[in-house]
Amino acid sequence: MASLDGKVALITGAASGIGKAIAELYAKNGAAVAIADINQQAADAAAAEIKAAGGKAIGIEMDVTSEDAVNAGTDKAVAAFGSLDILISNAGVQIINPIDEFAFADWKKMLAIHLDGGFLTTKAALKHMYKDNRGGTVIYMGSVHSHEASKLKSAYVTAKHGLLGLARTLAKEGAAHNVRSHVICPGFVRTPLVEKQIPEQAKELGISEADVIKNVMLKDTVDGVFTTVEDIAETALYLAAFPSAALTGQSFVVSHGWYMQ
């Protein structure tokens, strides 16, 4: 059984969805978890649930697009738990539109949250992971769209592709300091982020919501089944607990066969 006893994890976007599932599983397996989210109240609530179940957790308000906020939040996690061993860069949003109608402000917002956020949290975490070559694991939440493309998602696809480059560069640079990195690439997971997309895509594509699910989101899976937050959390646990750098700089697609590499 994987164990994270004595480890400290900082997880962004962890008040709900995939991030919360990872935080809960990490805590069950011995890690102290810092729940970082732009919504302080929601972060505190998620941390309280973990503590009520016997785990160690703290809620931290963090806007991943602000370097000052990221640095302050990361330092707060280290002050609370003494170290930082795992970073999960998970915060994200979705905005869809055709390229010719995509507002530049929305484009910049998407890249700021997904890609700048990944960079800023990594930079802040490395200050602690590089110290005395302590090491650590950085996991970026990518997507099948780190490898594929879909209509209406130019900014999202661009940002998720960018995380592959960041992770691979970190794998090479971080090796000297015992830092590993990966990208988890889920298929569609029925989180609030995806629930929001269903009516949006139905309207934009002129089809029913049922058709969006069956013929857009799950069309290329082998079984027509959504990936779950538990699937992603188990993958994140496996990668964080893996005992060596035999796995680093890799992309792990968890998508019911939607994308096979």
Name each region found by the language model:
Residues E148, A236, S244, T248-Q261:
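Short C-terminal tail/terminal secondary-structure segment
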Residues S143:
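Residue(s) in the substrate-gating loop at a strand-loop-helix junction
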Residues P98-I99, A103-L111, M217:
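Substrate-binding pocket helix/loop in short-chain dehydrogenase/reductase
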Residues I88, A175-R180, L247-G249:
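Short, small/polar-rich loop/turn modules that mediate ligand/substrate recognition or access, typified
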Residues K127, K131, K172-A176, A245:
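Alpha-helical segment proximal to the catalytic Tyr-Lys
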Residues T122, A159, A167:
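Active-site helix of classical SDR
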Residues D100, E148-A155, A176-H177, G224, ...:
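Active-site loop immediately N-terminal to the catalytic Tyr-X3-Lys motif
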